């Protein structure tokens, strides 16, 4: 028996040595992802890390990194897209029940190709099963300059009947280090972006959501990985990862029997055994990741640059400052009061007036959140001249006009629900559970897609000067049943999201220059697929400036300031309007406040702050962000932005709740030109107040500012300073 075992082992090794091994490389300027085809035709990841300088070094990489632990004599590796029922015993990337009931799949390399895309190169690898006519195409889009890679997969087949997919990952990545640490972000309403770090040990950690819509309300679709130590801001090997999917998602982190970490980003398979017909293609969400040897800061700046250039709708264009009426009026307004607010917006100096919830429905007028959703015509008793009258009043005031919609939702007390109850996600045989007094429309249904598109299209067709939409989504999916899918409920969750994409694609194709804010009861939706259609998202309904510093700090690791809406409100009136405005000015600035409640000096301050923001916007929205002092690590917070040419910078410094007589350290800036001499000037000062900073008006070299820094913190709660350097 031993002799037979040795003969088989020798045959395996001979086969390995005799076969030429094809190597496929996905590269940025700083990162290499290298794959290799084994002699038997299977595809394995052989390297993911710092870019290798010498091409000859790729020949030294081996696919067979370890032997199986079950007595198998042939060596094994890390399969790029591991299947279910084969020789891998861990979480698969793809799992299929074939038309005949067989649950095994073996994928073999067929071909690979490269094609140029805007800003990079896309590699497409085709894998096929030899027994069943099943094909998987792996896509990798590499952006060399930004050091970002985007990965997704396509699954198709030509079997005689539908197959069932029960795993369908975007990609599968392997890492090797002594220790692994993951930071994921959990949340709730008004409590977004809460980081939690843990060490990954043998076994599996899963981060997922099952909310359907508003899917990021409890878990955010992004994470940090730290190798050998928890991820740090300015040092150490890290990876930032995020999935572009506003529905149920799942991150699987699994440390295997040889200590390798497998990272599997995917649509959550919860209640989603997907029936795929022959000839159809199942396309997974995009997984975007950036690696760095210099900590989170470098990786996030790369993500920001990539997002603005290649992913976010109108990512290289300006953003509008605005005044929103919601916290001022709630549902209680009319055409005359809105016209006055438009004049206030003009006097404030912002670009636009945004009308929020409460403007629609007639049979069941939108007086509160119990009625009206679905009936998208202006309430005649409130707005006798309708949207055309509002657009006219805004134009007369000298500002643009934007409007709020929640087109994916319906109130049972609405004409839409009375006419089309079959358009609603609702159990036919059980009591109905309402979330915020509303239900979700079944957008997997093409008729509902037409209806939702028609809401925006009708408003824009009748009112082409409408300049902006705030698209809200305040409910998760409850009463899970799709009248459209009937007996095929396993496809519903996924097709619902795809239905939303179809609607948004139609809107974007017809109105490509229409800015839209993505909102979901706060930050319940924030992902890079939706940002292909939206210019920005609402970070949180929590606008308390203290809490906003924590939220904005977390989200800025993954999203540029240009995409993060932040409004000055009356939340936490114990803080000054200056502190609230300075917090919001570090993102995409807006106001949602009763301006008449401000004192004369406060009003002059916000007017000047808008002018100052307009001057600083190129740095904040399009420059490089450096997070300097974390609110999570003490009682202060500081960030700075630097223009791309490094000629200008802005520093935001905030005192949260300093301890009595605590030591106050200088803030060392980052990203400056070490050889340039900068003049420091404090801005956003209250009328009649002079700066109390010793550095104000002085000149310093960039080298000094980065090595010695400036004394800009105080020991007073709710104090803030904004310094412009040029």
What are these regions (language model features)?
Residues 657-726:
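C-terminal beta-sandwich/jelly-roll accessory domains of carbohydrate-active enzymes
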